[in-house]
Design a protein with these regions (language model features):
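Conserved serine/cysteine hydrolase catalytic core
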Residues: 165-222, 227-230
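Short helix immediately C-terminal to the catalytic nucleophile in hydrolase catalytic domains
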Residues: 84, 88-92
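The conserved beta1-alpha1 loop
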Residues: 18-20, 81, 204
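Active-site loop/oxyanion-hole signature of alpha/beta-hydrolase fold enzymes
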Residues: 33, 42-80, 87, 248-251
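Flexible "cap/lid" loop of the alpha/beta hydrolase fold
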Residues: 93, 100-135
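Conserved alpha/beta-hydrolase catalytic His-Asp/Glu region
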Residues: 131-183, 187
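Catalytic histidine-centered segment of alpha/beta-hydrolase-like enzymes
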Residues: 234-243, 247
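Conserved HGGG/HGGXW glycine-rich cap/lid loop of the alpha/beta-hydrolase fold
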Residues: 6-53
């Protein structure tokens, strides 16, 4: 499978970014441009998202292998947020030779109890009468009641694209909705006792509940060289809510 990719920078070590659910590689553009003077940056659209192909199932180990193929043979600093963070962790555990450093953003190597919020988004997006949409403003209005937060609504609508056949969702809503348990889960049993012994930066939003002290034990077991940083004034989307702080933390880790 060939993933859609955007490359920036011509010199320095490689940094690869994996976005989260409903995201695209371009979500990292601001951070990537800032790094591109000193690093070769690769932004990937994850399978079932953006311009990348769709899969028939959702399995973190398979997704990690697909991203590993996209990376190639040269070790990289791998950065992943949320769903992309789980893909990145699985990749580091399965292909440690490809990962020089790992950055995990606001997610832990655990199964989360519920994906109700995400299921609600998917049901709303699937329920939209796409055939009747002529302008993006109509799509935004259709989402307004179920997704009152304008920032989240704008984020979801990045996946709504006009094609020759009219408007459509770029994200594989049917698959993600059907496999929400796998998406919020963690393939710990399938990974066995695997650990990753390289340096790991574990970044969380101080206002998010995706990272907590109760997750630290499993993080320490799988990634014994992790360093945890909480960013004030940020929730789950740390790099979007506090981009300058996130960039500074990342640069220090890369130095």
């Amino acid at each position: 499978m060939s993933l859609h990719r955007t490359e920036l920078g011509q010199t320095g070590s490689r940094v690869v970014f994996c976005h989260g659910l409903f995201g695209q590689g371009r979500n990292w553009t601001q951070i990537a441009k800032a790094l591109s003077a000193d690093h070769r940056v690769l932004l990937l659209d994850m399978p079932n998202h953006g311009r990348s192909p769709w899969t028939e199932t959702f399995d973190y180990l398979d997704l990690a292998d697909i991203v590993a193929d996209a990376i190639g043979d040269e070790p990289v600093t791998l950065v992943g947020h949320s769903m992309g963070g789980k893909i990145a962790m699985c990749l580091a555990l399965r292909h440690p030779e490809l990962v020089e450093r790992l950055v995990v953003v606001d997610v832990a190597p655990v199964a989360y109890a519920s994906g109700r919020e995400f299921v609600g988004y998917i049901e709303t997006m699937r329920g939209m009468d796409v055939a009747s949409i002529e302008r993006r403003e109509q799509a935004e209005e259709a989402l307004r009641e179920a997704v009152p937060n304008p920032v989240v609504r704008s984020f979801l609508l990045q996946n709504f694209r006009r094609t020759e056949d009219g408007w459509r969702w770029q994200v594989n809503l049917d698959l993600l909705g059907e496999h929400m348990a796998s998406l919020t889960g963690w393939p710990g049993e399938a990974l066995g006792p695997a650990t990753y012994d390289g340096p790991v930066l574990w970044v969380g939003g101080a206002g998010s509940d995706y990272i907590s002290d109760e997750h630290a034990g499993e993080m320490d077991r799988r990634f014994p060289r992790n360093r945890r940083v909480l960013v004030k004034g940020a929730g789950h989307w740390v790099h979007s809510e506090q981009p300058e702080v996130f960039l500074e933390v990342l640069r220090r880790f890369l130095a």
